[in-house]
Amino acid sequence: MSRSVKKGPYVDPKLLKKIVEMNKKNEKKVIKTWSRSSTIVPEMVGHTIAVHDGRKHVPVYITEAMVGHKLGEFAPTRTFHGHADTEKTSKVK
C-alpha cells in the first residue's frame, strides 16, 4: 500500500535541510545518510548521496528518472555470489 497523497512523500528532515543549503550555495558534495526510506524529491537531482547498505555507504548519483523512488532501492543490501557448484564426479557404470 502506498503512502497517502494527503501526507506527501517522506524525506528525512535533516537530509532535506542539507540538500536545500547546498542548492543555495550551489555546491556538490557527497552526503552520507542512513535514511534508506527517504523518497527522492526533485531538489536532490544532480547530487551524490552515500546511502548506507548495512556495511558501508554506497554513492548514488541522483538523476531525474529516480524522482519518486526511495534511496534504499539504489543501494542493495545483499550480495549474491552464485549457487554452490556441484562436484562433477564421473559415474562408473
Curated annotation (Swiss-Prot):
GO terms for biological process: ribosomal small subunit assembly; translation. PROSITE patterns: RIBOSOMAL_S19. The keyword Glycoprotein does not apply. It comes from the Bacteria. Pfam families: Ribosomal_S19 (PF00203). The keyword Ribosomal protein applies. Keywords: Ribonucleoprotein, Ribosomal protein, RNA-binding, rRNA-binding. GO terms for molecular function: rRNA binding; structural constituent of ribosome. GO terms for cellular component: cytoplasm; small ribosomal subunit. Protein S19 forms a complex with S13 that binds strongly to the 16S ribosomal RNA. Belongs to the universal ribosomal protein uS19 family. PANTHER family: RIBOSOMAL PROTEIN S19P FAMILY MEMBER (PTHR11880), SMALL RIBOSOMAL SUBUNIT PROTEIN US19M (PTHR11880:SF8). This is Small ribosomal subunit protein uS19. The lineage of its organism: Bacteria, Bacillati, Bacillota, Clostridia, Thermoanaerobacterales.
